[in-house]
Amino acid sequence: MIDWLVIWGVTQGVGFVFKPILEDLAKDAAKDYIKDFFKTSLGNVIKDLINKEPLQKAIGKAIKEFLELVQQELEDEDLDENQLKKYILPFKKLLKNESVRQTLGSAFDSNTKLVNINIVADIAKEVVPTLPPDFNWSRVAKRYGKKVQAIRMNSDELRKILDSENLDKLVNQNYEIRPEFDLEKYQESIQEQYGNLKLEKI
């Protein structure tokens, strides 16, 4: 059984107040998020993908980064732990919104330089209690974009899925994402290791 919280790096975060949100997300391995999160970059191809695990890994990591940035903004306003905990349920509700998921997921699109955080901010006004006056959504968006690009760059599997040239192959059940195999290097290593064997004596 996959421990999604470990994969997403949640267990490493000391003092991470939004951990309960990720614990709920881990119950269905973020499957409920996939369609909305990657709608911009993958569209209808998602339903045909056989191996969705790289997407599940990326979603959890991205949401963790987003919530950590939100917590950082709140802590900069000198909110104590009890005050921070009041934001858990509202932000959990915020992340259930389809438009919010699509906006956060759009950061995985290579053509997206900066997510349209105004969409998230406007919806947050309806579901999140009054945020501190200096809470900066633009700063969250900028930092979040960099975090997501790092997630993308650090996952070969994810990059191959998001590469549009691979989509047709990935929907084929006979195709699996595999590490690149260097045939020439393999041949050289075989020759070095066994080149001196005198096979005629065997």
Give, region by region, the residue ranges found by the protein language model.
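Structure-specific endonuclease nuclease cores
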Residues: M1-I202
